[in-house]
Amino acid sequence: AGRNAHKTFLPAAALLDMDVHWLYPKDNTGYLSCNLSAEDISDYLERTTEKPAAVYLTNPDYLGNLVDMASIADVCHQNGVLLVIDNAHGAYLKFLPQSRHPMDLGADLCCDSAHKTLPVLTGGAYLHIHKAAPASFCANAKEALALFGSTSPSYLTLLALDSCNRDLAEEYAARLRETSGELTALR
């Protein structure tokens, strides 16, 4: 796991009895940043004696930095390792002129905290499972949601997600392009 994983990652890993091996980038100059490269991941996978079940990264990081997801996904898949992404601050990445969303760049599993960068109430999120991921992922995801999720989901949050889905399908990409253009002009 990248060293900048969200603090809830550790209790979840402990509950699931997972051994976590921390990954540090060669260029470790940032305080909140942990911009791992494909080379960092490859080096780790070459020198480890026990192949991990997955590489877990936070992307984008808390400062908005993005890793080269496609290259990292290639390294993971060449080594038979799954790539799991905490995309908490990047739900909008799918709607850039060229998608930078982890699922489009090779991630096997990805969670978007829609409430952070999309018009959704707090707690609203999307869990994406790649169609090429192992078949057990869907069943395991349902079990995990039963363990970690609520038995009484907020209908307001579900409605906000549904409304957001409609907005994403209809006009969000155009509005994002327009806003990005305006911000670029201000620079």
Question: Residue ranges of each PLM-predicted region?
Answer:
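Conserved PLP-enzyme active-site core in the AAT-like
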Residues: 1-187
